[in-house]
Regions:
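Post-cleavage N-terminal segment of exported redox proteins
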Residues: 1-24, 70, 97-101
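Short N-terminal micro-motifs specific to bacterial/archaeal maturation
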Residues: 12, 19, 58, 81-84
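Short pre-active-site segment immediately N-terminal to redox-active cysteine/selenocysteine motifs
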Residues: 24, 32-38, 43, 74-77, ...
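Gly/Gly-Pro-rich "capping" loops immediately C-terminal to redox-active cysteine motifs
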Residues: 25, 29, 41, 45-70
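Axial heme c-ligation environment in periplasmic c-type cytochrome domains
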Residues: 47-55, 70-101
C-alpha cells in the first residue's frame, strides 16, 4: 500500500514539475520575442555579426547562473537588462534558451 501511495505521489510531482517547466519556457519565449528577437533572431540564429547562434555555438553550454549574469549585466554589444526585466523574466528566458539545445 505504501509503495502505491509513494508511486502516485511521485507521478503527481513529476506532472507538476513538467507543467511548471513548460510554463517557464512559454513565458521565456514571450520575453525573448519581445526583448531579444530583434538582435538574436526568432530562432536564436543571431541576426547581427558577432552574436551567438544559440543552436550551434557554445553559449548554451554555460551554466544557468552564467547566462543569467550575461542577460542581467550585458556582455560586449549586448546591453544590460537589469531593471528592465525581472529576475523571473530572466530565468524564464534562460529556460527558453535551453529549449534550443
Amino acid at each position: 500500500m505504501n509503495k502505491k501511495i509513494t508511486l502516485v505521489l511521485f507521478v503527481l510531482l513529476q506532472i507538476y514539475a513538467l507543467q511548471t517547466l513548460a510554463s517557464d519556457v512559454f513565458k521565456g519565449r514571450e520575453v525573448f520575442m519581445r526583448e531579444c528577437m530583434a538582435c538574436h533572431g526568432e530562432a536564436g540564429e543571431g541576426k547581427l555579426p558577432g552574436l551567438p547562434n544559440f543552436k550551434e555555438g557554445q553559449t548554451l553550454f554555460k551554466t544557468d547562473s552564467a547566462l543569467i549574469d550575461i542577460v542581467r549585466d550585458g556582455k560586449g554589444v549586448m546591453p544590460s537588462f537589469n531593471g528592465l526585466l525581472t529576475d523571473e523574466d530572466i530565468r524564464n528566458v534562460v529556460a527558453y534558451l535551453r529549449s534550443f539545445l
